[in-house]
UniProtKB/Swiss-Prot annotation:
Cysteines paired by S-S bonds: none
PANTHER family named among the record's database cross-references: APOLIPOPROTEIN C-I
GO biological process terms on file: lipid transport; lipoprotein metabolic process; negative regulation of cholesterol transport; negative regulation of lipid catabolic process; negative regulation of very-low-density lipoprotein particle clearance; triglyceride metabolic process; very-low-density lipoprotein particle clearance
Name of the coding gene: APOC1
Alphabetical list of Pfam families matching this protein: ApoC-I
Gene Ontology cellular component terms for the protein in this record: high-density lipoprotein particle; very-low-density lipoprotein particle
Similarity section: Belongs to the apolipoprotein C1 family.
Protein name (database record): Apolipoprotein C-I
Sample GO molecular function, one term: phospholipase inhibitor activity
Signal sequence, renumbered to the chain: 1-26
Superkingdom to which the source organism belongs: Eukaryota
Role played: Inhibitor of lipoprotein binding to the low density lipoprotein (LDL) receptor, LDL receptor-related protein, and very low density lipoprotein (VLDL) receptor. Associates with high density lipoproteins (HDL) and the triacylglycerol-rich lipoproteins in the plasma and makes up about 10% of the protein of the VLDL and 2% of that of HDL. Appears to interfere directly with fatty acid uptake and is also the major plasma inhibitor of cholesteryl ester transfer protein (CETP). Binds free fatty acids and reduces their intracellular esterification.
Gene source species: Arctocephalus gazella (Antarctic fur seal)
Amino acid sequence: MRLFLSLPVLVVVLAMVLEGPAPAQAAPEISSTLERIPDKLKEFGNTLENKARAAIESIKQSDLPAKTRNWFSETFNKVKEQLKTTFS
């Protein structure tokens, strides 16, 4: 009984696959795709620029750079003092 039902389903699926894509799903022409490449690249560049600017502004406004700088300064001074006391 299962084989009797699965064969027609298999035939219908095979027919749909062999039919190919519908006209609305067909790939666009190469020339139209090539014409849109500069616009897409410009849009990508603008988006990337905006995101980079936003990230840089976020970093500038955060306390992370100042905290990092202070930590490095403190650590460097501690190491310098330890070296002075060790080799003096």
